[in-house]
Amino acid sequence: MSKVLVIGCGGVASVAISKCCQVSDVFTELCIASRTKSKCDALAAKLAPNTKTKITTAQVDADDVQQLCDLINSYKPDLVMNIALPYQDLTIMDACLACGVNYMDTANYEPENTDDPEWRAIYEKRCKEAGFSAYFDYSWQWAYKKKFEDAGLTALLGCGFDPGVTQAYCAYAAKHEFDTIDTIDILDCNGGDHGYAFATNFNPEINLREVSAPGSYMENGKWVEIPAMSIKREYNFDQVGQKDMYLLHHEEIESLGKNLPDVKRIRFFMTFGQSYLDHMRCLEDVGMLSTTPINFNGQEIVPIQFLKALLPDPASLGPRTKGKTNIGCIFTGKKDGKEKTYYIYNVCDHQECYKEVGSQAISYTTGVPAMCGALMMLTGEWTKPGVYTVEEFNPDPFLDALDKYGLPRSENHNPVLVD
């Protein structure tokens, strides 16, 4: 029996909450909190008739530590699931520390204002020392490790699909399939079609910042950075088909490089259609992806936030998206002295997701792992004081839960490799 506070009520949060309500013997009580309480109320009203989980709602500004503390102290949850924006990771972690509550999220911290002088100085120092220049990394949250250890609390970072399940796949491969792993290629393919010329499948602001950043990968323990979208490969994905994919910087590369230091190379690829890339490049060229505030008719606006307001809400894409996603990891290495390859992945159908929880597969593949990660924490499978990423825990019960609750794994012991 557990009480959980979920902060956020967007597409991913809605899936995670819906899945929590399917496991009422563990998630006995849920409080859904967001800046817009009416969204929480609507979701609660939709779910309440079909679950034994007791659902309440609350309004909270996740940028305000005191508001968060007031809510946490009032509700007294066993766990806070942060499924809000990554800009708010640190304030929510601060509140959890102040109130003595375990924490989890689905994406690592990044700043909302990348022109803030204090943040900029730290960022530029990190770029020189680490060797990559994407705006998001784990250093801010890893800095909380001792605080959580001293408090006897667990913080689980990045428990979506990628990051999240992909790291569990890596831990599983290291535990069961290999004696030594030489290379890891993480492949994220969305073969869905929503019918729009341009739309993003999750938060547009976060998505566009991610894909317009310089790409990077880890080789022999060091970062190699490349211009954005400059390395392209083709791959034939199971149940999706041949797709173009591009090398991106992604946060799990950083944690995997730290926790699996003997791996010689770690890369991340994501598929994109030509229409998406053409639109993104045009928007970038005219300044619409900028995070720097500008003055327009006497009002300050941030271009990328204005663009977000114009684009379709990712939560609205569910009923019109058809096709499948395929996300997984390809490994090379050795087992019992012999060369070996291995591919573990999940295929998810957009329309099946919509039938079950009213969501497209992008939100589903992030929301289900969030629920399963919370399940691991609440049942005692994943608990140790400190700040951790998914690969630092036992992958077996987590992958079993994913198999059970909607994201079953597939395996290929002779996959085509990415050159």
PLM feature segments, named:
Residues 14:
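Residues forming the Rossmann-fold NAD(P)(H) cofactor-binding site
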Residues 29-31:
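Short beta-strand element of Class I
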Residues 61-77, 84, 88:
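Conserved Rossmann-fold cofactor-binding substructure of NAD(P)-dependent oxidoreductases
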Residues 86-89, 93-202:
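Glycine-/Pro-rich loop/turn segments that contact NAD(P) or position catalytic residues
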